[in-house]
Amino acid sequence: MADYYNVGKVTSAHGIKGEVKVYPLTNVPERFYDLEYVWIFDDQQRPHKYDIEYVKIISKGVCVKLKGIDTRGDAEKLKGAFLKVDSQNALELEENEYFIKDLVGMKVYTEEGSFLGTLVEVLKTGANDVYVIKTEEREILIPAIKEVVKKVDVDNKVMVVHLLEGL
């Protein structure tokens, strides 16, 4: 099975012509302009290909018109769906950049070797991403900055962090 990468999540219908408002899950929302198609998985986890008719950058997201989604009702059915790209359309990563799908599920340890928890979510903020680490008792928010994240081992699903005072 091919690898697929989430590039956005449908948050709502936009207008009456079948457009969907998408929350980008990429740090380059303009990349939607370069996409010819996206994949959306159905309830049985089968991929369906949708050609992109056009894209508009809007406040708090991207407006996307998918071929075959022609009414507001069609668009509303996609609310909550992830727009995905296949591996041939994935962006090349820079050094120390990672796909969210590769980070989620990582076991997180302190520099001292203590198990902290599991990375369960990546929050996109203005300045830097924030990793949500689920411990036995609670969730901890860790800024995704080099002063905190000391090592990321994608192959072994392990992250090592230096906890700043107050975390």
Swiss-Prot record:
Compartmental location: Cytoplasm
Record-annotated PRC barrel domain positions: 94-167
Gene Ontology cellular-component annotations: cytoplasm; ribosome
GO molecular function: ribosome binding
Keyword DNA damage: no
Family matches, as InterPro entries: PRC_barrel-like_sf, PRC_RimM, RimM, RimM_N, RimM_N_sf, Transl_B-barrel_sf
Primary location group: cytoplasm
Annotated disulfide bonds: none
GO biological process: ribosomal small subunit biogenesis; rRNA processing
Keyword rRNA processing: yes
Keyword tags: Chaperone, Cytoplasm, Ribosome biogenesis, rRNA processing
The protein's role, per its UniProt record: An accessory protein needed during the final step in the assembly of 30S ribosomal subunit, possibly for assembly of the head region. Essential for efficient processing of 16S rRNA. May be needed both before and after RbfA during the maturation of 16S rRNA. It has affinity for free ribosomal 30S subunits but not for 70S ribosomes.
Quaternary data: Binds ribosomal protein uS19.
Family: Belongs to the RimM family.
Domain notes: The PRC barrel domain binds ribosomal protein uS19.
Protein name: Ribosome maturation factor RimM
Organism: Thermoanaerobacter pseudethanolicus (strain ATCC 33223 / 39E)
Gene responsible for this protein: rimM
